[in-house]
Swiss-Prot record:
Belongs to the protein kinase superfamily. Ser/Thr protein kinase family. It comes from Dictyostelium discoideum (Social amoeba). It holds the Pfam family Pkinase. SMART domains: S_TKc. GO terms for cellular component: cytoplasm; nucleus. ATP binds at L318, G319, R320, G321, G322, N323, G324, T325, V326, K348. Residues 312-586 form the Protein kinase domain. This is Probable serine/threonine-protein kinase DDB_G0283301. One of its GO terms (molecular function) is ATP binding. It catalyses: L-seryl-[protein] + ATP = O-phospho-L-seryl-[protein] + ADP + H(+); L-threonyl-[protein] + ATP = O-phospho-L-threonyl-[protein] + ADP + H(+). Signal peptide: none annotated. The keyword Nucleotide-binding applies. GO terms for biological process: regulation of translational initiation.
Length: 663
């Protein structure tokens, strides 16, 4: 049976309310086999018992204008063989017909279903006759405290009375005004679109405090169910979930019991996911056996803020990624002097909160807590949301990607940013007994904030970060990250290591350099006309040992440093400590003689339009270095299968075919 068929079967069970009676806050659903199983939450008024024989035909009664004798027979079965005009007779004061009085006064369940079914024979004109208030008989059920809800359900579910959208709105308003919360719940199960009208009705109608609280609860729960449903089960399940909540059966156990009773297929995965998210509590991370004890220890240190202490500006989106969306927000705290202060923060809300996804979110939280403030933004804590939770971190001005794009970058700023970046990586690799690898270093994941004294640069998004341990070997071998920045050794099934982060850092340096030299930000390997898709462009470039072209006028020491960070052979790359030392040396060299580093627009234009001998020699030198290394190291025998271009003529011909020539 498909998910759709499953939904239809279960929805039918949810909607076919066999016996409904009113309690103070919920609607109870019972299947009644006989009179003994009927359980009422409120005591029934005493019924007048007649000693004379029961009168079964209302045609034999002489009715008074105000139906004064209806109370004498309203608890018994009705004979519908009398003249139909009789049922249209109206009370002179209220204008109520027989059916109005029936809906208002009926107190016995005996033969109730058959009596309501027999009303169909009276015809639409009779059934939908209106009183002096222009109300059909359905409105009279509001005054029936004993069986009003039951009669309303029978009239609607048996299609005895049909009400259009305007009629539903009027009935909903009347139910709210009368405080008939039970009927409001039922009407929502009939037409879930009425939910959207509750707030508007509350604004224009005078309602009791109890009713207002009920409307607020209904709206908040519906928003929660919609938010979960759209992400987990889809729109088709939202109505089913909410109906179960309204009927008071919103628990996994009750649905499973229904499945067993009706011998339905096993519960769909969508509903399993839904219940996990709906019933999720912040402390549930201790139940996730997939989380290692060392992570649990870090997570337990994180502060949990109530939602009232945090405001989230949903319209002010700071960033979006595959693992979540970051919003601007404000955290209210009390300072040492007892004054309330507002702290600008960023709030990351994970995309999904299923069990499998939560494990990854908690791992990210644990690493964030472990390196808190050392090489990443400060972690304030978490806030429990309507659905799941949000991660509260220090707010920065922008990402490095946006900073490069919107600012002029010279070599002074290049060295300032590059040094801060590589020092951050060094701190990340050394801040724990087991090294921590970021695994997704790129300009988008660097945050920049300008203070009075300095430019602060930190790493963000630790969703892929992992410790260097034996238990993480399988994870460190997986192909993860952003294509252009992924180190080439991952294609060769080599474990992610410290120097893998260095490769991604080197590619980020190239993007900085492009802005310094060309005045605009370009993606790495943009010179090569291989493919419009970044992934394929990167793969082809790496397989053929190409590197981004660096202007030849720059000092050789600087070019060698950049090339070393992006070396195809990871063992030939410098580690983070060596990168810091070499950058400091290069910065000193730059400050001593800036004329060597001046951007020569004429040379740049020539190199962008033609393949100069220096560029060809540069590529030849790099490829021959790889060739020599491969021949001397059996460990990299897999590289020998790759086609290499070693002669200068072959390199020139190859580069000419893929370089993007610009006039």
């Amino acid at each position: 049976m498909t998910s759709q068929n499953w939904k239809n079967c279960f929805n039918k069970k949810a909607i076919e309310v066999i016996e409904i009676h009113r309690s103070q806050e919920t609607i109870t659903v019972e299947t009644v086999n006989n009179e003994d199983k009927i359980k009422n939450n409120i005591s029934k008024p005493k019924i007048k018992v007649h000693k004379k024989p029961i009168i079964k035909s209302i045609s034999k009664l002489k009715l008074q204008p105000k139906f004064s004798r209806y109370n004498d027979i309203i608890d018994y079965s009705i004979d519908f063989n009398c003249n139909k005009n009789y049922f249209l007779k109206q009370d002179k004061v209220s204008g109520n017909t027989f059916i109005h009085v029936f809906c208002e006064k009926r107190e016995s369940k005996i033969n109730l279903e058959s009596d309501i079914e027999n009303l169909k024979c009276l015809g639409k004109e009779t059934i939908e006759a209106r009183n002096n208030n222009k109300e059909i008989a359905l409105f009279s059920t509001l005054k029936n405290q004993c069986l009003g809800l039951k009669i309303m359900h029978e009239l609607i579910s048996r299609n005895v009375m049909f009400i259009d959208d305007n009629g539903k709105d009027e009935l909903l308003v009347k139910c709210l005004e009368e405080g008939r919360v039970d009927m409001v719940k039922y009407l929502i199960t009939v037409d879930i679109n009425l939910i959207s009208k509750l707030k508007r009705i509350c604004q224009i109608t005078q309602l009791s405090l109890e009713t207002l609280q009920f409307v607020e609860l209904i709206n908040s729960e519906y928003e929660k169910i919609v938010e979960i449903g759209l992400k987990s089960a889809g729109r088709e399940y939202i109505k089913l979930f909410f109906i179960q909540f309204i009927l008071g059966n919103f628990s996994k156990e009750s649905i499973i019991q229904t499945i067993d009773e009706y011998k339905l297929p096993p519960i769909p995965k969508e509903i399993e996911d839904f219940f996990f998210v709906y019933n999720y509590q912040m402390c549930d991370f201790v139940k996730l056996t997939e989380i290692k004890p060392r992570y649990l220890n870090e997570i337990s240190k994180i502060n949990i803020y109530p939602i009232g202490q945090v405001s989230i500006e949903r319209r002010n989106e700071l960033g979006r990624g595959g693992n979540g969306t970051v919003y601007s927000g404000v955290l209210k705290e009390i300072d040492s002097q007892g004054n309330e202060i507002s702290i600008p923060v960023a709030i990351k809300i994970p995309t999904q909160f299923y069990k499998s996804k939560l494990v990854e979110v908690y791992k990210e939280l644990a690493i964030h807590q472990k390196i808190n403030g050392i090489c990443g933004p400060k972690l304030f804590g978490c806030v429990k949301l309507n659905v799941g939770f949000g991660i509260i971190i220090e707010r920065f001005d922008c990402s490095l990607h946006d900073y490069i794009q919107n600012n002029n970058i010279d070599f002074d700023l290049f060295f300032e940013l590059a040094l801060k970046m590589v020092i951050t990586i060094r701190n990340l690799h050394k801040c724990h007994l087991n090294e921590i690898f970021h695994r997704d270093i790129k300009p988008h994941n660097w945050l920049v904030k300008k203070t009075k004294d300095e430019l602060v640069v930190v790493l963000s998004d630790f969703g892929l970060s992992r410790e260097n341990s034996e238990t993480n070997e399988n994870t460190l071998q997986k192909y993860r990250g952003t294509s252009v920045f992924i180190p080439p050794e991952l294609n060769d099934n080599i474990l992610y290591n410290e120097k893998s982060d260095i490769y991604s850092l080197g590619v980020s340096f190239m993007m900085l350099l492009y802005k310094v030299v060309y005045g605009k930000m370009e993606n790495p390997f943009y010179e090569f006309k291989i493919s419009k898709m970044e992934y394929f462009k990167t793969v082809v470039a790496l397989e053929n040992f190409l590197v981004p072209i660096v202007p030849t006028f720059l000092p050789d020491s600087f070019k060698e440093f950049l090339f070393s960070t992006m070396n195809r052979i990871y063992t030939c790359r410098p580690n983070s400590e060596e990168c810091v030392e070499r950058l400091i040396t290069l910065k000193t060299e730059y400050e001593n003689d800036k004329t060597k580093w001046q951007v020569n627009s004429a040379i740049i234009q020539k190199e962008k339009s033609l393949l100069t001998d220096s560029i060809i020699s540069q590529q030849l030198k790099l490829m021959n270095q790889v060739k020599k290394f491969v021949q001397e190291n059996d460990k990299f025998v897999f590289l020998k299968k790759t086609k290499l271009f070693f002669s200068e003529s072959e390199i020139k011909q190859y580069l000419l075919s893929i370089i993007k020539c610009q006039e």
